[in-house]
A protein has these predicted regions:
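N-terminal [4Fe-4S]-dependent radical SAM core
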Residues: 1-36
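Canonical Radical SAM [4Fe-4S] cluster-binding loop centered on the CxxxCxxC motif
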Residues: 23-63
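Hydrophobic faces of well-ordered beta-strands that scaffold small-molecule active sites
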Residues: 32-36, 79-83, 111-113, 135-137, ...
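Short, basic/glycine-rich phosphate-binding loops at helix/coil junctions
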Residues: 46-49, 76-78, 143
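Canonical radical SAM enzyme core domain
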Residues: 55-67, 88-134, 139-146, 153-161, ...
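Short Fe-S-cluster ligation motifs
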Residues: 71-87
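Acidic (Asp/Glu)-rich catalytic clusters
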Residues: 71-75, 126-131, 165-171
Length: 188
């Protein structure tokens, strides 16, 4: 396993991945996907949320982040960036500023955003939305009312919101729906 050093911290970078072949593990050029937690803020209150107990590291130092992205690109090991939270769309201006920074460094960078769909109509105001690799929207029930109950919030995307967002995109496949199936939601 290769190791890289960033800001006096050594990090391992995998040089293998799992496959469905009999040997199951295949060696490859070391690559990584950078995960950026934009915020801890979220207007949902999911019972199963893993971010409830997560530590708030404050705001992102964009200069340091730009350094890290450039460094990983120079090493030729960065294959994409995922932006998560909390809920990234509680801070759309910061999200779009972050995306602008990423695309200024590499206009072809694969960038994915994970969201519960809160404020998703704001994406139409971002001129580079069609450059995104994907927008992963969490849905836990097909019925909007039941979905809001599971999220314990009325601030999440409705089916209509998602359809409107998809309608504004050139590539309709950018939208991915992520679902967590729970026993309490299956029969409702």
């Amino acid at each position: 396993m290769e190791r890289i050093k960033i800001f006096d911290t050594e990090l391992p970078v995998k040089d293998y991945y799992c496959t469905d072949s009999p040997t199951n593990i295949k060696k490859t050029k070391p690559t990584l996907r950078l995960y950026i937690k934009l915020t801890d803020q979220c207007l949902a209150h999911c019972k199963f949320c893993c971010n409830e107990q997560s530590k708030d590291f404050g705001t992102i130092d964009l200069e340091k982040l730009a350094f890290v992205i450039r460094y990983l690109k120079e090493k030729d090991i960065l294959h994409g960036i995922s932006i998560t939270g909390g809920e990234p769309m509680t801070k759309p201006d910061e999200l779009f500023q972050l995306l602008d920074l990423i695309y200024a460094i590499d206009n072809d960078m694969e960038v994915a955003i994970s969201t519960n769909g809160y404020n998703c109509r704001e994406f139409k105001n971002y001129d580079k939305v069609n450059q995104l690799e994907s927008i992963h929207i969490s849905r836990h029930h097909y019925n909007d009312k039941r979905n809001k109950e599971i999220f314990c919030s009325s601030h999440i995307a409705t089916t209509e919101d998602i359809i409107e967002l998809q309608g504004n995109l050139e590539d309709k496949k950018i939208i991915n729906i992520n679902t967590m199936i729970m026993r309490s939601g299956i029969n409702s």
